[in-house]
Amino acid sequence: MNNKTNVLLQAEEMIKPLALEHVPQDSDVEAVIDQWLHAIATDSQFYCNPEISKPEQLKERVISLLQQNGLYTTRNAFFNEVFSALKLKPDFDAKFRFIDLFAGIGGIRLGAQANGGVCVFSSEFDSFAQNTYSFNHGEHPFGDITKVQEKNIPDHDVLLAGFPCQPFSYSGRCEGFEDKTRGTLFFDVLRILEQKKPKFALLENVKGFKSHNKGETMFIALKALEEAGYEPHWTILNSYDYGVPQYRERWYCVAIRKDLGITDFSFPDFKDRKTKLKDIINLSEDDQSLSITDFEKNRIKYHFDNYEKQERVQHDNSMYEPHTKKGRHGVFSFLKPDGSLRFHVGDVAKTQIQEAFYACLETYAPTIIANRVPKLWDIQRKLSVTESLRLQGFPDEFNFRVSKAQAYKQLGNSVTVNVVQAIIENIIKIKD
C-alpha cells in the first residue's frame, strides 16, 4: 500500500525487528506488520506463534515501543492513523471479528464490514489481487494459506472463505471425511475451524459445486464440516435477487458450531429488490477503449434484425427467454482467447452454451467471469470498470492499481457484496 501516513510508515520500521523475532521464519513480514498495526487499532489479537510469545503480551510490548517513540497515544488516535487514508474503513467498535481466506479483492470482507465486523487476518495467493486488496483495505494479505499455521491465526467469531472447487479423494482408504479433503484448500479451512473454533463460517463456491462429481464433492465437504463440530446449511443464491442487475448463481454455506445449540438457519430472501442495467450505467461514458468494433456492431445488428423479423426480439432489444434458455435457440457469442468474438445463431448443444455475452439496459447482465466483460447492445460498448464494480455490489470508491484487464478479471473472480452482506445480517441475528 502506498498511501500510508508518515506515522504509520515510521511505526512499520519500528516494529519490524520484533516481527522478525516473534513470527515463523517463512512468514510474510509485510503482512505480519500490517496485521499487528490493524490489531492495535481495532483492539484485536496479534498474529504470532503462541509457543514463542503470548499474543496479548507481545501486543502490549509493541504498543509500549510505539508510545516511547511518540507514535501511539490513544487507540482512537491510532485508529485514525491506520485508516485515515482508506475510503472503506471498519467501525471503531467492532460487533464481531472475522478472517478472510482466499480473499481475492475483499468482496466478502466488505459484506462483513457493512455489518460492523472487523477483519483480523486475511490471506490471498494471487499477487495482483494482493495489490488491489492492500490498496483498498490497508493491509497486505498473507499469501499461501497452506504455509500458515492455524495456531498463529488470531481468534475470531466468523471464518469467511470463497474456496476453490477441487476434487476430493474417493479411494475409500481414509478413515474420516476430513482425510478425504487432504491436498485441497478446503482442508485448510477445516484445520483452521478445528483449531480456532469460530462460532460461524460462511463459505462460497460456484453453483456447480453442488453437482461436482455427481454431488460427491459437496457431500464430503458437508460431512467434513460436521466432523469438525459444525452444522452446515447451504443453498444456491442469485445476485440478481439481491439488488444488482447480474444473473450470478453461487453456492453458499453457513456452518454453525454445534455447541451453540442453533439448529436452524434461514438464508435471506430479497426477490423484490431487482434492478436493471440502466440503474448502474453511465450513459454519458465516453471512454473510447470501451467501444466495440464495427464488425461486432454489424454482426449484432444483423442477428437482432433477423430475430426481430421472426418476432423473437422484444422492444427493449432483449431476446425472449424461451429461445435462449429452454429452447437453446438464439444468438450466442463466444469469447476467443485473443479477445475477439465468435457468433453462433441457431440451435446449440447444451454443452456448448456459454451465457449470452451481450446485455440490454432493460434486463440484467450475464454472469461476470474472469477474462470476459459483458457488452451493452443498446449503447454498443463494453461495461466500464466502475459499472462492473456496481454489478458486483462494490462501491464506486473502490480503486484498482492494476491493468484494466486485471481489474475485470478480479471482479469476475469476486463475490457479490450484497449477497454476503444479506447472509451475514442473518448470522448476526442468531449470533445476538
Write out the residue ranges for each language-model feature:
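S-adenosyl-L-methionine-dependent DNA methyltransferase catalytic core
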Residues: 1-119, 132, 224-227, 250-432
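Core alpha/beta nucleotide-donor-binding catalytic domains of modification enzymes
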Residues: 64-65, 69-200, 207-219, 226
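Conserved S-adenosyl-L-methionine
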Residues: 142, 230-241
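A short, glycine/Asx- and small/polar-enriched loop/turn
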Residues: 154-155, 245-250
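Alpha-helical scaffolding within the catalytic cores
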Residues: 187-188, 239, 384
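Short beta-strands and strand-loop turn motifs
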Residues: 200-206, 235, 401
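Short histidine/acidic/glycine/proline-rich micro-motifs that form metal-
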Residues: 206-211, 239-243
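A short beta-turn/loop motif at secondary-structure boundaries
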Residues: 242-245, 359
